[in-house]
Regions:
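An anion/pyrophosphate-binding glycine-rich loop and adjacent beta-alpha core
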Residues: 1-87
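N-terminal low-complexity, intrinsically disordered patches enriched in charged
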Residues: 13-16, 130-131, 165
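Predominant activation on well-ordered alpha-helical scaffold segments within soluble catalytic domains
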Residues: 10-11, 94-97, 101, 163-171
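Short, surface-exposed, polar/charged, turn-prone segments marking secondary-structure boundaries
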Residues: 27-29, 56-60, 127, 135-136, ...
Length: 174
């Protein structure tokens, strides 16, 4: 994204990471080519390099990576951007392969409540009757959905929590 990483896996992991990231930065390692092991990726890079042997390094990665990721990988690889592919050494190529299999990002924070997809915090479920969703502290007050201190991984679980707790609360209103 414009400000960091996103997607289903990140959303699921963020539930756990959010608790830690408030205390310290986290290191995220991404395999940019998960379908290939290192040897297969090296073969792929060799094949791509053979086809692009007269191109500069920075212009040779378009079959391997999304356009916006290429400048980042070029910089992190420490291979000179204008170096011709036929001049790239085996060590440089192996460094590129290692980078693609172990792409590291430092996570420094969250984007905040206004951009949150899932939130944490709220009324403790210990203070709510789970059968009726009525407050154990204040009679006649009911809680449902994201007002509760409950969050789940992606896949519709948060929606199901909202629907189920709303149903339980509504069924017990007088």
């Amino acid at each position: 994204t414009h400000f960091g990483v996103s997607g289903p896996t990140v959303l699921s992991a963020s539930s756990y990471a959010a608790k830690v990231i408030r205390q310290k930065n986290l290191l995220l390692t991404i395999d940019l080519k998960p379908a290939l092991d290192e040897a297969q990726l090296d073969e792929r890079v060799l094949r791509d390099f053979e086809e692009a042997k007269n191109k500069s390094f920075k212009n040779s990665l378009d079959k391997l990576l999304p356009k916006k990721l290429i400048p980042v990988v070029v910089e992190l690889s420490k291979i000179p951007p204008d170096k011709k592919i036929h001049e790239v050494t085996k060590q440089e190529r192996q460094r590129l392969v290692t980078l693609l299999k172990n792409f590291k990002l430092t996570l420094t924070g969250l984007r905040g409540f206004q951009e949150a997809i899932i939130t944490q915090g709220g009324v403790s479920v210990k203070e709510v009757n789970p059968a009726t969703m009525e407050s154990k502290l204040v009679s006649g007050v009911y809680f449902a959905g994201e007002v509760l201190d409950v969050d789940a991984v992606t896949g519709g679980f948060n929606l199901q929590i909202a629907w189920s707790t709303a149903y339980a609360a509504a069924a017990h209103l007088s």
